[in-house]
Amino acid sequence: MTFLPQEFIRKVRDRAPLDTADVARFVQGVTAGDVTEGQIAAFAMAVYFNELPLSARIALTLAQRDSGDVLDWRGARLNGPVVDKHSTGGVGDLTSLVIGPMVAACGGYVPMISGRGLGHTGGTLDKLEAIPGYDVAPSVDMLRRVVRDAGLAIVGQTAQLAPADKRIYAVRDVTATVESISLITASILSKKLAAGVSALAMDVKVGSGAFMPSAEQSAELARSIVDVGNGAGMRTAATLTDMNQALAPCAGNAIEVRCAIDFLTGAARPARLEAVSFALAAQMLTMGGLAADAHDARRRLRAVLESGAAAERFARMVAALGGPADLVERPERHLPRAAAAAPVAAARAGWIERIDARALGLAVVGLGGGRAKIGDTLDYSVGLSALAELGERVEAGQPLATVHARDADSAAQATDAVRRAYRIGAEPPAQTRVVHAVIE
């Protein structure tokens, strides 16, 4: 029987029972070009309003995985599990840059397929492109070699990995259907499955700087990812973490790379960044069979940080992908620095009771460190550092942050935006946990 995309779309629209084979045929048509952009848009909007049942979410994920190459690591003679983590994105979220090396130093292999920033959230690829010479788009053969030799490679999605997802996402991005939980789930997991990952630790953000607008939707997304990931044969767990302020006390591409290097070398390990990084990395070790339990995993992770083994893995990856061999030893020599720096003075004394993390991310975009639209050229040097945290006591005139900008005018604009993102009150706010819940 001839497969008609419009009939499949009608079933999704009307919430009729879906045959998983039809889901696969639709994705095959997307890959081959037989399904038009209009039909993809209609499908995406139908899913946005109705969502998909679990069986169809799994089928969509597997079909998108199978639309291109699927990496098989069995012939690579790796002596450890292939594991990964993924975040829904936020501000100052540089966990990938520290978790990957930590897990690699513990015996895991991490082929991390990452993305660029859009809107207020920073992208891991943008951070890495602040490193001179770093190749975020190596060939599949090079990806295999770097993962085998360094234990990790943080790179972008290639044209060969989940191409159907790439086409569907391009349509979602211009049709107001990005926020569909079913489509987000399939997009994330199809790329991880195509990379040959056997276990995934998912970081789902909650709060003012989160991708999902409410805590309830964040929890729903986490549950969907766990159920579909496990249903597709990849051991998956999700952690709900706080994004009511920047995760690290910095935001911006080169600035966050420097913060990651400081974390790995022990020069500075901010408590919130450490809490989330250890929680996710410990999940990766336990799911991958590299640690008996969370306590054992944390002990191993602490050991590779203190010994310098994790920093060495990061340096090895950077050099293998074309970056400077001495980046970890001499970051100031290689990372770009902004021409202007300006403190953001507190307007009054009191306690920091609220931070609009999304506004901080948009301030970085305004400086030129993020994209207002796809294709924008970035200034990798700009951003924010020394960000004050929720619950801190500040005096009038005390710096809330430092703005790094290309010139004095853009620094002044960002200074005003950052100051408005902070609300200072007379009483200290209630303390909140950085790790809210774990879903398995």
From Swiss-Prot:
Coiled coil: none annotated. One of its GO terms (cellular component) is cytosol. One of its GO terms (biological process) is thymidine metabolic process. One of its GO terms (molecular function) is thymidine phosphorylase activity. Pfam families: Glycos_trans_3N, Glycos_transf_3, PYNP_C. SUPFAM superfamilies: Nucleoside phosphorylase/phosphoribosyltransferase catalytic domain, Nucleoside phosphorylase/phosphoribosyltransferase N-terminal domain, Pyrimidine nucleoside phosphorylase C-terminal domain. InterPro entries: Glycosyl_Trfase_fam3, Glycosyl_Trfase_fam3_N_dom, Glycosyl_Trfase_fam3_N_dom_sf, Nuc_phospho_transferase, PYNP-like_C_sf, PYNP_C, Pyrmidine_PPas_bac/euk, Pyrmidine_PPase_CS. PANTHER family: THYMIDINE PHOSPHORYLASE (PTHR10515:SF0). The enzymes which catalyze the reversible phosphorolysis of pyrimidine nucleosides are involved in the degradation of these compounds and in their utilization as carbon and energy sources, or in the rescue of pyrimidine bases for nucleotide synthesis. Belongs to the thymidine/pyrimidine-nucleoside phosphorylase family. This is Thymidine phosphorylase. It comes from Burkholderia pseudomallei (strain 1106a).
